[in-house]
């Protein structure tokens, strides 16, 4: 196949393709080989025994015990106050410092459970790994990212729980959300180190400008080599006397030029965006809660009215500054609790359900399923139910925390599954997505149970995210292909690309020798 309009480009394309050959070959091998390490870690690394947090089944009557515990222990300020399941049953969890261990209180006798954050982390570690009897070698509170727990995991602080196992199994757990934040062992940590060394060049992190410049130039070489090579293929007629290496190189070019251009182009875009663009995303806690004892009424409804079960319970402030309890109900209780969400707005297909299919268990960690849906609110001061809902709450929080006015709000959506704009690294479900017609084109994600701003996505970040998700990670295949199948196909393409590059170098060496 020939395209005559490309003839004027033939000479410069040939010149630059030859000049860039060695750099392109080295660059492709570095990133293709290291890229193969990513699915390798997924296939051969340690596996979770449980994909979701321990199920919370809490009696609603616990809400009346919260003010008594706080008053007895003279707690009048906290970042987060919530009731969570634990090894000892339902306990009150109080977060007073963002990076310090959380405090826990027994709701049956109001006593503080000393150093329980560590015990809670151990319990979660055993839940997720299924290692009920294996000894735990160490438990460490980690407040910074490192090579074994890189920044892409997002959650801090976490507990690093190391088991006394032959493979050095280690799990990172986030006690506020009861989430697993990462699972590794000696083998995976080593492979991950190779990946970060070869793929992201983290060894140059202390010289960021040099890293961006070198990686960017090599990626640009790959882009130019791909484009000039394809120009040659489309403008030169194959000779009947060509060697088999040249014929294979020519034919393989048709198959891999587009994926190769997608990998290198999206990688370059990702690198430059991370280095240059303003970063607006990231978890942000709500303003600290402060209160006086008389703001917490111990008379919460009647025991009869609280005779139902909850998925979660937390203390937050409404937009007027009044303390309220948020009681998260199982979905089948929505009609019985006196309040049902009627404000969920969705458009088109639910992008978070992947066309309604139940995700295979191995993909469950990436899709997520929210088990806490509707909620009702009780005034902490009066003990009576208030007419309020999650949508009103998160809209007010976005205005208070980010200064995003109601006039710019274009739509709201309850997110119950991980997807394109809100991925599994955030760990929290459900959250509310708020879309704003702001200068930055904000998509804001807020956890209604705690008031935490989980993520903020601007137009610039969204466009780069589309590029990286579709062209670099091939997530466009998710609606019709399982993750493992996708990874196998991507690995075959990378292997073919290395063969293609190797043949190109063989041709260059032979041409020079002749």
Feature locations, PLM:
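Conserved histidines in hydrophobic membrane contexts and catalytic metal-binding motifs
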Residues: 2-514
